[in-house]
Amino acid sequence: MANYECATRTNCFRVKDPEAFRKFMSRVYGGCKLEVWEEKDAAGNIQFGFGCYDGISGYEPESPETADDDCDYGYDEFLEVLQQHIAEDDAVIILECGHEKLRYITASAIIVTSKDIESLDVCDIAASRAAVLLNNPSWCTKCDY
């Protein structure tokens, strides 16, 4: 049996409160160590990015007093809290690419703004585009096998 292996990385983005964001990201976990980067853009604003050689699983409670037994927050909750940190006029694009040997090869993008969360899958996008190029709206294919 093969293991799923992936890498995850974001674009550069701005947040409302850099210190609060750093604190939140210190509680985010995945299959390996999450790296968080920051740099200043041309206007001097702090931009962040993050990534890891695995997927993001969720985040840990802020303190033991606020946690139930075995309490941690999953990926959906991670996205909801991330959404609260993003600057109003910016977006986080979380890119993940992975594989399980050659059986599954996946690539996705999750776009998170302060108001919306949308998920894109490269197989779906490619199949839709192929149908357009073939001028056959009902064309479909199997990408995972």
Task: Label every PLM stretch briefly.
Residues 2, 32-37:
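A contiguous, surface-oriented mixed alpha/beta subdomain in the mid-to-C-terminal portion of proteins
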Residues 1-28, 144-145:
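Short, extreme N-terminal segment that most often corresponds to the first beta-strand
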Residues 28, 39-145:
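Charged interaction segments
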